Amino acid sequence: MGLVDGYDTSSDSDLNFDEGKSVHEKKNGNLHEDTSYEPSSNNIHKRKSHFTKSELKRRRKTRKGDGPWGSWSSSDDETSQASETQKEDQDIFVHALAEDNLDSEQIEVEEVSHFYGKSEKDYQGRGYLYPPNDVDVDLREERISFRCYLPKKVIRNYPGHPEGTTALKFLPKTGHLILSGGNDHTIKIWDFYHDYECLRDFQGHNKPIKALRFTEDCQSFLSSSFDRSVKIWDTETGKVKTRLHLNSTPADVESRPTNPHEFIVGLSNSKILHYDDRVSENQGLVQTYDHHLSSILALKYFPDGSKFISSSEDKTVRIWENQINVPIKQISDTAQHSMPFLNVHPSQNYFCAQSMDNRIYSFSLKPKYKRHPKKIFKGHSSAGYGISLAFSGDGRYICSGDSKSRLFTWDWNTSRLLNNIKIPGNKPITQVDWHPQETSKVICSGAAGKIYVCD
């Protein structure tokens, strides 16, 4: 029956086979007339056998030979089972160890403070925060009411921190105390005028100190550490007022100038957290700033506390309003490098940023926040290190550390390099601060650990 009229299912295969055979014979003449038709093996599709994993394993065991596909001996089987069991136990151990390490970071470290001075109070009941009267300098004078001069040489040193000093600050306004932190997990307060000794230490972190900041009234200071914690200490008693446990390393902390209860923390996960210790909910967190794309490097408030500046490893500098998660200005350029340190000029509307291309750049504090094309300070080597910078009390000079153990000083108005002092130790000088009341005294320290005073 033809294809148009339909077909019979019972004879369809026979017809198709005969038609195919006749066509094949016609094409090849009489070659196959006397031979029986045998379909080739290529036309026969054998069904592939599928085995389970256990069946395949059983088949491999029955194979003979010493090759890679040979049979398995009972000892090899036992060895493989033992190795699998050992691997599972090892995975469980590694997982448990990771959990223990995570828990160890959250373990409370014993917070203690020891006083090493002669007496904690004077005859009138005042602590060491009260500025001394028996020194040649009026420590209550306004900061910019005197003229500063260049430091010329190293005059003395403090033991500092044997494994390296990572944070260094004068007590604001008076400068009769030095606050330092180091890789030995310890914070120390030093006497600057009398016995040049450590007055008190603060122990409460289990990893190196990252940053230290005084509050405006100097009654407290903030500390951040690689143990992912931020603590607020009482400067005189050594007691911890507030402690925060974070999920990322706090790279920098900054206290708001007009409000000692507020502070910001820059994290290595690119976020900036704004805290108020008067708020009880959520550990006092009032705002999160999350526009940066990489780790926060430095934070600095405007002198009036209305805004703050942030620098990040994403090679941008951003300016923020308080408690508004939208930056009002982003400073970026294709040739711009990371800027690991920020500082504000004491008398003019500028802030400076230490750059990884061995330069210090100046930016305006007024809207548009443009970079000053002529106020660029260079000559030192800062690439690869988070080196700090400081201004003299009257704003005439700017000084910076150096990766080759030197202290550089420039003229602020002309950007001219005035001098550099070789610091003992032959290690990078990463911490620098200018005395707020002395005309030419600068402290500096770094990986060597000792704190040097230049005058």
UniProtKB/Swiss-Prot annotation:
Identify the stretches annotated as WD repeats. Answer: 160-200, 204-243, 291-330, 334-373, 379-422, 424-454
Q: Which InterPro entries match?
A: G-protein_beta_WD-40_rep, PRPF17, WD40/YVTN_repeat-like_dom_sf, WD40_repeat_dom_sf, WD40_rpt
Q: Say yes or no: keyword Repeat present.
A: yes
Pfam families listed in its UniProt record: WD40 (PF00400)
Biased composition (Basic and acidic residues) is annotated at 18-35
Q: Record's SUPFAM superfamilies? A: WD40 repeat-like
Which keywords annotate this record? mRNA processing, mRNA splicing, Nucleus, Repeat, Spliceosome, WD repeat
Q: Name one GO molecular function term.
A: mRNA binding
Q: Where in the cell is it found?
A: Nucleus
Its assembly, as annotated, is: Belongs to the CWC complex (or CEF1-associated complex), a spliceosome sub-complex reminiscent of a late-stage spliceosome composed of the U2, U5 and U6 snRNAs and at least BUD13, BUD31, BRR2, CDC40, CEF1, CLF1, CUS1, CWC2, CWC15, CWC21, CWC22, CWC23, CWC24, CWC25, CWC27, ECM2, HSH155, IST3, ISY1, LEA1, MSL1, NTC20, PRP8, PRP9, PRP11, PRP19, PRP21, PRP22, PRP45, PRP46, SLU7, SMB1, SMD1, SMD2, SMD3, SMX2, SMX3, SNT309, SNU114, SPP2, SYF1, SYF2, RSE1 and YJU2.
Q: What does this protein do?
A: May function in the second step of pre-mRNA splicing. Regulatory protein involved in replication and mitotic spindle formation and/or maintenance. Required for initiation and completion of S-phase and for initiation and completion of DNA replication. Might be required for the maintenance of microtubules. Essential only at elevated temperatures.
**Name of this chain's protein:** Pre-mRNA-processing factor 17
The lineage, from the top, is:
Eukaryota, Fungi, Dikarya, Ascomycota, Saccharomycotina
Q: Which gene encodes it?
A: CDC40
